[in-house]
Regions:
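A cross-taxon signal for low-complexity, glycine/charged-rich
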Residues: 4-12
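Bacterial N-terminal signal peptides that target proteins for export
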Residues: 16-29
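Bacterial N-terminal signal peptides
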Residues: 28-39
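Boundary at the C-terminal end of the N-terminal hydrophobic targeting segment
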Residues: 42-47
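A contiguous strand-loop segment
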Residues: 49-176, 197-213, 218-368
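Second-shell loop/turn segments in exported
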Residues: 166-170, 179-188
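Substrate-recognition/cap regions that form aromatic- and gly/pro-loop-enriched pockets
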Residues: 403-532
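Histidine-centered catalytic/metal-binding microenvironments
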Residues: 517-581
Length: 581
């Protein structure tokens, strides 16, 4: 079953709309501007106010999926997309574990920058080490370990009074969310264990935002999914003060539900008598002390409203798209699709419904698959008022004096090209960085049951490759990326190169992408039963042999993805450059 989110662009026919013919040369001028300014396509201008919009998380309980898997997922805009296996280790009693600043960075303007693989940044503190750690996959925001524990992360907004900025030697808080994720993956087997450990770490050592906001995590294991939301407590906090160094709350996702986090906290009312809720002791007290909530008012305490600013359209639109797609009959959703009974509004002027309109989670009307999650992650809001490729600015004169969509039409135009053509910008779900879908299956041994469907760069263009939880290594192509130095031996650079070439003639070139990528990716899915049957047979005789088989297969597949993108790059260069007219 598919929710139809992966239909390729480029089928737009003629449209009877008036247009000034001066737009035609403007398109070519805009394309020239895109070529010059493409490296800055995903970054905001200096001094612009930015709110978190880079991460979309989807979590799904086991009774809502096609085969009983549990899913958590993550699309991320972080530049630290390199993935490598950190093996489990043993330590002496009394050893200390370093706490780092600099695991993540966000492009050229971030002074944290790219570090050598395995260097996790400046050590700003220590916590007690455990005697044995588990193997996990390390990325900017590490996401999965050998025991099928997986975490999706989404930075959220918080009220400015809660903000904490890192100043070496001054800031007392030391625990970033990405560091807490690493500790959880190294030390925990279940979602509940991870939730409680992360909550304890941010309370004890102080939550230090690395992206300037609060954080939401979708933590999953083969049995259940939890959402954990964390706010900082401002720069005045002191360790040892007896006050928690963070404000946090958590809610369990019903087993037959799907939850979305779109850079905005999702929990509203908290009922600590219900075992599906957990929270810090100060979850309400901080709001009372700061004058943000009056217990005598008679109004219920709403977590979301107490600590977060008003939700923005870029957050709402993702909630709307996914919830209205998987649960269309749940309620009267805003009409924002361009087909059927479309809305009289456009993204230039419409009523926004507010965060309270959306439930914490929804029960999908059809069972969800890995491919469905991938489809949402690749979404550019096709067929909706947010579809930037549907903007009339792309229309050019065609045969018989009819207006047709320019071959340059793309949902991923650079900021300069959008300014030139006066295209209203909107945040797509697909965004540059890296991401994953974690598929967790309790009926299989951990090394086989957990699959880390991983991509780099833009998921709309990239290929998802399955990495099994028990593998001992990954392809060197996926361990290599430096934004300041191009490399043929970097998966991220190869995908990015292809994406830039697609813009030479997007409407035609994207068909070449599908022709090259889709059969390879589909092969990963169709061969899954055979691969896992063989791995399970090996595991029953010798678990080490199963791990070796899956490691070799995973590395080979990751290499095949890079080879495919190299070949596609060569095709696009020869087909859409040179002597074309």
């Amino acid at each position: 079953m598919s929710f139809g989110m992966t239909a390729p662009l480029g089928k737009g026919g003629s449209r009877e709309r008036g247009m000034n013919n001066k737009r035609v040369p403007m398109l070519w001028l805009g394309f020239a501007a895109w070529i010059v300014l493409a490296p800055a396509a995903a970054s905001a201008g200096a001094g612009e106010e930015r709110s978190p919009e880079g991460c979309t998380v989807i979590g799904v309980g086991r009774l809502a999926t096609v085969d009983g898997s549990v899913f958590t997922s993550h699309t991320d805009c972080c530049s630290e997309c390199r993935v490598h296996v950190v093996p489990g280790r043993t330590f002496k009693k009394g050893d200390l574990a370093p706490v780092h600043w600099g695991m993540v960075y966000f492009g050229r303007d971030d002074d944290r920058g790219c570090l050598p693989l395995g260097d996790y940044g400046k050590v700003i503190g220590h916590i007690p080490q455990v005697e044995k750690t588990f193997s996990y996959f390390h990325t900017g925001y590490s996401q999965m370990n050998e025991h099928q524990l997986a975490i999706g992360e989404s930075t959220c907004s918080q009220k400015p009074a809660l903000d904490v900025a890192f100043m070496e030697g001054v800031t007392k808080q030391i625990m970033t969310i990405e560091q807490a994720q690493v500790f959880a993956l190294e030390r925990c087997r279940t979602a509940r264990e991870a939730l409680k450990l992360i909550a304890s770490l941010v309370e004890t050592y102080g939550f230090l935002p690395s992206c300037g906001g609060s954080e939401a995590l979708c933590i999953a294991d083969p049995k259940e999914v939890w959402v954990l939301e964390v706010f900082s407590v401002g720069p005045e906090w002191e360790p040892g003060s007896g006050k928690p160094g963070a404000i946090w709350a958590a809610r369990r996702v019903p087993d037959d539900h799907l939850v979305v986090i779109s850079n905005y906290v999702r929990i509203r009312e908290i009922d600590l008598k219900d075992p599906d809720f957990l929270a810090s002791t100060n979850y309400m007290r901080e709001a009372v002390d700061r004058g943000w909530y009056d217990p005598k008012s008679g109004r219920p305490f709403i977590w979301q409203e107490a600590y977060a600013p008003r939700i923005k359209e870029g957050n709402l639109s993702r909630l709307w798209l996914i919830y209205s797609t998987v649960a269309p009959s749940l309620k009267e959703w805003p009409r924002r699709r361009l087909t059927g009974s479309s809305s009289p509004f456009t993204m230039y002027g419409q009523d926004l419904e507010g965060a309270a309109f959306y439930p914490f989670s929804v029960k999908p009307e059809k069972k969800i698959s890995v491919k469905d999650i991938i489809g949402f992650q690749r979404s550019a809001f096709e067929g909706t008022i947010y579809d930037m490729a549907a903007d009339p600015a792309w229309l050019v004169p065609g045969p018989q004096d009819r207006l047709v969509k320019s071959l340059l039409t793309t949902p991923f135009a650079s900021p300069e090209l959008k300014r030139l053509l006066r295209i209203a910008s909107h945040r797509t779900i697909a965004t540059q960085g890296y991401g994953m879908v974690a598929q967790l299956r309790g009926w299989l041994p951990d090394p086989i049951g957990g699959i880390y469907w991983f991509y780099v760069d833009n998921p709309y263009v990239s290929a998802y490759v399955p990495i099994y939880a028990g593998v001992l290594d990954v392809s060197p192509f996926y361990k290599n990326y430096d934004y300041a130095r191009f490399s043929e031996d970097s998966a991220r650079w190869m995908v990015d190169f292809v994406e830039k070439l697609l813009h030479l003639r997007w409407q035609e070139a994207v068909k070449d992408l599908h022709a090259a990528r889709d059969p390879l990716e589909e092969g990963f899915f169709t061969s899954q039963p055979e691969v896992e049957a063989k791995a399970l047979k090996l595991h029953e005789k010798n678990p080490a042999e199963a791990v070796k088989y899956l490691t070799d297969l995973t590395i080979s597949r990751m290499n095949d993805v890079v080879k495919m993108f190299r070949s596609l790059r060569d095709l696009l260069l020869t087909k859409y450059t040179g002597d074309i007219v």
